[in-house]
Regions:
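Alpha-helical transmembrane segments and their short interhelical loops
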Residues: 101-173, 220-244
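Membrane-spanning helices that line or support transport/gating and their immediate boundary helices
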Residues: 77-81, 85, 154-161, 192, ...
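Transmembrane helix-boundary elements of multi-pass transport/secretion proteins
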Residues: 4, 18-85, 132-141, 171, ...
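Transmembrane helix segments
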Residues: 43-45, 160-203, 207
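A short amphipathic helical element positioned immediately N-terminal to and/or at the very start
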Residues: 4-20, 213
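Transmembrane alpha-helical segments of integral membrane proteins
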Residues: 208-218
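Hydrophobic alpha-helical transmembrane segments of multi-pass membrane transport proteins
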Residues: 32-41, 57-129, 156, 175, ...
């Protein structure tokens, strides 16, 4: 193995062990939170709301909750790891290691993808016996899953690089990630919104991630699957380019 490959494998192992050592917090807790949302909203809205013909509200809700958990936990994994390394001062050991910016980028993102894949599989394992879902377009489903998870992992890495203390990460989470994920069509179809909010929803990249993921289950969505895939792909490329530029320059990492 080359020095870069060894550096990548070591950093990836470190990041995986970081979330695996506290599995109750990083995987079990998000699953419990999502199941509680499902129980509360399913009981409150079942029979009163239906987005698609032949699809119950509980079925409609579940893919959105899975994707919301994926979005929030992918962001949390990379952002918390980066800011923790910066605040504690051990980022210097990563920067001194024989690992390039691309390998560093891939290691952080891959660890976040592994974490949210565990979260999604656990949620499906717990809920599918009670809320059966069709899998109409599995390739579309998988594509949107990894685009969304990758985008938020990269966005979390950017936030961790920009932030100088834990409060900055909390601000980004509470004022950007949480509102954007809640207002992205998780609990409702955007067709039920007034015209202004309907069009405003289309400015939210999280909406396309969730809507496209939902299409993978039902073969139906609020916008065409290719549109969601295009927007999600463009968002991933944009944030990845910005993050790689930051890592290459060592912005707020070396100085």
């Amino acid at each position: 193995m080359s020095p870069d490959q060894i550096g990548f494998a070591t950093l990836l192992k470190k990041e995986v062990m970081r979330f695996w050592s506290v599995l109750a917090q990083t995987v079990t807790a998000p699953v419990i939170t999502a199941v509680l949302y499902l129980l509360v909203f399913a009981q409150a809205m079942q029979g009163r709301a239906s987005a698609y013909d032949g699809v119950s509200y509980t079925q409609f809700l579940l893919p959105g909750l899975i994707m919301m958990a994926v979005i929030q936990n992918a962001f949390a994994n990379t952002s918390s790891s980066m800011i923790q390394s910066k605040v504690m001062g051990n980022i210097v050991f990563i920067l001194m290691a024989p690992i390039g910016p691309v390998d560093m980028f891939l290691a952080y993102v891959a660890a976040a993808l592994l974490r949210v894949t565990c979260v999604a599989i656990a949620m499906l394992a717990v809920t599918l016996p009670f809320v059966p879902l069709p899998f109409e377009a599995p390739l579309v489903l998988v594509g949107h899953f990894f685009l969304a998870a990758g985008s938020l992992a990269v966005l979390g890495l950017i936030a961790g690089i920009v932030a100088q203390k834990f409060d900055h990460i909390a601000t980004f989470t509470n004022f950007v990630v949480m509102p954007a994920s809640f207002l992205s069509g998780v609990f409702y179809s955007v067709h039920s919104l007034p015209p202004f909010w309907y069009h405003a929803s289309h400015l939210n990249p999280f909406f396309f991630m969730i809507d496209g993921f939902r299409y993978g289950f039902f073969g139906r969505a609020d916008v065409a699957a290719w549109v969601s895939l295009l927007w999600s792909g463009c968002f991933f490329v944009a944030v990845s380019a910005l993050c790689l530029w930051m890592l290459q320059r060592g912005w707020r990492l070396r100085h």
